[in-house]
Design a protein with these regions (language model features):
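Single conserved hydrophobic/aromatic residue that forms the stacking wall/gate
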Residues: 1-7, 11
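Signature of short aromatic-glycine-proline-rich micro-motifs recurring in repeat-based ectodomains
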Residues: 38-59, 101-108, 185-186
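Short coil/turn segments that connect the beta-strands within blades of beta-propeller domains
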Residues: 65-66, 112, 154-155, 195-197
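Surface loop/turn motifs at the tips and blade-to-blade linkers of beta-strand repeat domains
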Residues: 48-49, 97-98, 136-139, 180-183
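Surface-exposed loop and turn segments in beta-propeller and other repeat-based domains
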Residues: 19-49, 89-98
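Structural WD40 beta-propeller signal
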Residues: 61-63, 110, 150, 192
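Conserved beta-strand element within WD40/beta-propeller blades
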Residues: 68-71, 115-117, 157-160, 199
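Short loop/turn segments that connect beta-strands within beta-propeller blades
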Residues: 13-16, 80-83, 126-130, 171-174
């Protein structure tokens, strides 16, 4: 995996030479169905740009070198030694079984266990990424940038977080007390002073 201000590329060694495999505008040209951009936001690799300077991870299954994981904004998997890659779930599709939160900083195998570190916490797979599970429950790791609460009724709170969306609390109404109303970053939340049921 190579990253610079001009390129984000994946290289594969075949024999004595290294050859460009995929990702981004340099040196293989604009992204398309064959030259996918794994550092971008789209799950088909069709967009130009990305966050390779911020999210850059690579892991190879220690028991099967055909299984390669690349992390950028999204998680990508190859089952054919890097010949092709697919994105099992876009960064904004948490309902899918292969979902990993956006902005993947590290991917590591420990035996058969596969771990991901990303802006959304820690994710885990016991089957090389076919199913991925959130492992951050019970960890107080969300950084609130700002939030609002009802002036009369303190049961309603709306807060903006760093990389974990906008979170709403309404007493004990939601699972784990909070509901994510929007993804990404938000620096604040507002609750109507006149009607605390409007946030």
């Amino acid at each position: 995996l190579q990253s610079s201000s001009a390129a984000s590329d994946v290289y594969k060694r075949q024999g004595d030479n290294w050859s460009f495999q995929c990702c981004g505008p340099h040196p293989a040209g604009a992204p398309d169905s064959i030259n996918i951009n794994m550092m971008g936001w789209q799950p088909d690799g069709s967009d130009d740009g990305g966050q390779y300077y911020y999210d850059l991870a690579l892991a190879v299954n220690p028991y099967d070198a055909n299984i390669i994981h690349v992390g950028g904004v999204n998680h990508w998997i190859s089952y054919d030694n890097g010949l092709t890659f697919s994105c099992p779930a876009k960064w904004s599709e948490p309902h899918k079984k292969g979902y990993v939160h956006a902005d993947i900083h590290d991917i590591n195998y420990f035996g058969n266990d596969l771990w991901f570190a990303c802006d959304g916490g820690i994710f885990y797979s016991d089957n090389s990424g076919d199913s991925i599970y959130k492992k951050q429950f019970g960890i107080a790791g969300t950084d609130f940038w700002g939030f609002g609460t009802g002036f009369v009724d303190g049961e309603i709170m709306l807060g903006g977080t760093y990389h974990n969306g906008t979170l709403l609390k309404d007493g004990n109404t939601y699972l784990n007390d909070w509901l994510c109303t929007d993804g990404g970053d938000n620096i604040r939340g507002f609750v109507n002073f006149g009607n605390p049921r409007i946030a």
